[in-house]
Amino acid sequence: MTLTDYVREVSLADFGKPFKHQASWNRRLRTTGGRFFPKDGHLDFNPKILEEHGETVFRQIVRHELCHYHLYFEGLGFRHKDQAFKELLAQVDGLRYAPRLQSHQANYLYICQDCGQAYDRKRPINLAVFACGRCHGRLIKKNQS
């Protein structure tokens, strides 16, 4: 079963309305589970959500994006702040926020010498140039284990 077929099935089962556009995977999504594009009506989904959190959570994210989709084409408020969106999301048991992905691993850990603020980074920081954002103290590199 393709992703578009799966979204069509969820749309009919949970909303009673057809999904008439395309759904696709987008590996570049990092912090969201999916995106709705009002311009052409297609949906993008993050495959890492399905891999790490399973089919139940992924189905809730599909419901979330379908709330945007159906409300937009009905001419109702489809944004997160709109009451119609919040009510429909609650009716279909969709997720309000996407769960954090565990695949994001920090490679470097820096600690401020003065205030103890910790900074996890994927890329190294030039310690001669950068300082603590909270107290402007000197940063030191700790071994990540």
From Swiss-Prot:
Cofactor field: Zn(2+)
Source organism, top-level taxon: Bacteria
Note on how the cofactor is bound: Binds 1 zinc ion.
Gene Ontology CC, one term: cytoplasm
Principal localisation: cytoplasm
Keyword Metal-binding (UniProt): yes
Intrachain S-S bonds: none
Identification of the protein by name: Protein SprT-like
Organism field: Streptococcus equi subsp. zooepidemicus (strain H70)
